[in-house]
């Protein structure tokens, strides 16, 4: 059996929800306190045992490459001033086996994954989406990517991460139609449906941003016609793959943080900061103070 060694991180999106900040800065470089969102993804991959990572980028994404490259001037300056802890943080982002390829035009997630065909070769691989951060406030939690890799060791089949979402939100996700109940958190799947309307959704089990796929997916993606949004949808290709070989779904029970919109990004930043040793106490005190002020502002005033 071939070991899962490689991961793909699609990062070619335009990040329009975060304009004007993302006009010249990659959305994936927006920080949660002091760490870019893409670094959380890379760290999850490494903790899971991934050996090589390909980042699929687009225009205005050079900052991602720079972040994971050496910065001699900065490193020399930190070393000269004896700032060894900061130097260690910088070194952690450069000692990684990262590759980059550019998607010329954003044609959907399926097309972004297809750019990695030569990199992956004939091996199983993981796709990790940057909008979904998993268990970032729980250092002891088993990474979701690692869970998928362990499933593959047992089934030798593609496995997609899913999570229950409110029924009214299913139209924002790919959704699975499970075959019966899960066995130790693993579902057999009848069909995969991209962004169904709530009345048409086969379940509330939504696909979240972790996929373990066999290389046969590339042949399907090459023939895949555009789907929802006139883009090449990875969910559609997975549904086709499921017709010729088993595809399972792993239900995630941890904490998922959606940093793909402003409010989700803010919530993630607050939760992470409340566990950050340098700011958590000050932030807790500020939130308590702010909460009291907000409660006070709700008290109606009466003129005499």
UniProtKB/Swiss-Prot annotation:
- Output one GO BP term: UDP-alpha-D-glucose metabolic process
InterPro entries named in the record: GalU_uridylyltTrfase_bac/arc (IPR005771), NTP_transferase_dom (IPR005835), Nucleotide-diphossugar_trans (IPR029044)
Q: Which cysteines bridge via disulfide bonds?
A: none
What catalytic activity is recorded? alpha-D-glucose 1-phosphate + UTP + H(+) = UDP-alpha-D-glucose + diphosphate
| Alphabetized UniProt keyword annotations | Nucleotidyltransferase, Transferase
Give the E.C. number(s). Answer: 2.7.7.9
A molecular function (GO) held by this record is: UTP:glucose-1-phosphate uridylyltransferase activity
Task: Report if keyword Transmembrane is assigned.
Answer: no
Give the similarity note. Answer: Belongs to the UDPGP type 2 family.
NCBIfam families attached here?
galU (TIGR01099)
Can you say what this protein is called? UTP--glucose-1-phosphate uridylyltransferase
Species whose genome carries this gene: Streptococcus pyogenes
- Which taxonomic lineage is given here? Bacteria, Bacillati, Bacillota, Bacilli, Lactobacillales
Q: Give the gene name.
A: hasC
């Amino acid at each position: 059996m071939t070991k899962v060694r490689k991961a793909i991180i699609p990062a070619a999106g335009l990040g329009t929800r975060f304009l004007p900040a993302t006009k010249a800065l990659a959305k994936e470089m927006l920080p949660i306190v002091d760490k870019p969102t893409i670094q959380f993804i890379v760290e999850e991959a490494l903790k899971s045992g991934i050996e090589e990572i390909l980042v699929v980028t687009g225009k205005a994404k050079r900052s991602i490459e720079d972040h994971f490259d050496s910065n001699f001037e900065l490193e020399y300056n930190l070393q000269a001033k004896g700032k060894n802890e900061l130097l260690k943080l910088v070194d952690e982002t450069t000692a990684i086996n990262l590759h980059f390829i550019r998607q010329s035009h954003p044609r959907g997630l399926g097309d972004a994954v297809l750019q990695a065909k030569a990199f992956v070769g004939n091996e199983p691989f993981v796709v990790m989406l940057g909008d979904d951060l998993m268990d970032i406030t729980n250092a002891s939690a088993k990474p979701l990517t690692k869970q998928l890799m362990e499933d593959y060791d047992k089934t030798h089949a593609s496995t997609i991460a899913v999570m229950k979402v409110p029924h009214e939100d299913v139209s924002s996700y790919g959704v699975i139609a499970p075959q019966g109940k899960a066995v130790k958190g693993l579902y057999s799947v009848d069909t995969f449906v991209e962004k169904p309307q709530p009345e048409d959704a086969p379940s509330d089990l939504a696909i979240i941003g972790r996929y373990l796929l066999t290389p046969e997916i590339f042949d399907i993606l090459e023939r895949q016609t555009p789907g929802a949004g006139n883009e090449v949808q990875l969910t559609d290709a997975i549904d086709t793959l499921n017709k010729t070989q088993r595809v399972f779904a792993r239900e995630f029970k941890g904490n998922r943080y959606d940093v793909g919109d402003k409010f989700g990004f803010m919530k993630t930043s607050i939760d992470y900061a409340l566990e950050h040793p340098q700011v958590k106490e000050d932030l807790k005190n500020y939130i308590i103070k702010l909460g009291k002020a907000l409660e006070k502002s709700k008290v109606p005033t009466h003129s005499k």
